Amino acid sequence: MSRAVIQPFEEYQRSRIIFVQTVAALAGGKDNRNVELLKRLDAIRLLGPLLTDPVISIKQYAALAIGTLAGADEEIASQVVNDDNGHILNLILKSLETSNRFYKKTACRLLGKLSKWKSLAAKVVSGGVITFLVSCLEDCDGEVKQFSANALQKICMNGEDLAREVINAKSIENLIEG
């Protein structure tokens, strides 16, 4: 193939990788002004579609950036959960089914960040998160199990009803067996 044809595609991929890595780094920085600025720049709207990117590292960094932003700001977390009837949340759950352990760790961490907000936990749970987190407890990777258990714990901390849903999903058995 001609280099002139391949080059724009390689540049496009490099640009996406640089974008998600940079946003993730800015979101995770110590300066809360970055989070506010990223919120004003509507970073979540730009990161959401990258959760379906065929390049796993782009998908993983997008999830990392979204999780970091959602953990830092309840309004951003609300946007993730409520955007187009939970479109971003559904993308996260859908990609968990087929992803590698590195993405699963990042996605479980993101789900934990969303679940920490009391005002959003019930909506996160109604999106089917518990089923996916319980299935991650069966993963052979210890860190996937750890982040999944952490997310389930955050759900439980938001009320008796949610804790009961976690227990009813057989999560305790999976934790004990794991």
Task: For the regions a language model picked out, list residue spans one by one.
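Alpha-solenoid helical repeat architecture
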Residues: 8-11, 51-54, 69, 96-99, ...
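Short, hydrophobic/charged alpha-helical patches characteristic of ARM/HEAT alpha-solenoid repeats
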Residues: 3, 7, 14, 32-41, ...
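Alpha-helical solenoid repeat architecture
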Residues: 17-31, 46-50, 60-74, 91-95, ...
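Short, intrinsically disordered, charge-balanced linker/junction segments flanking boundaries
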Residues: 172-178
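Intrinsically disordered, low-complexity regulatory regions
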Residues: 1-25
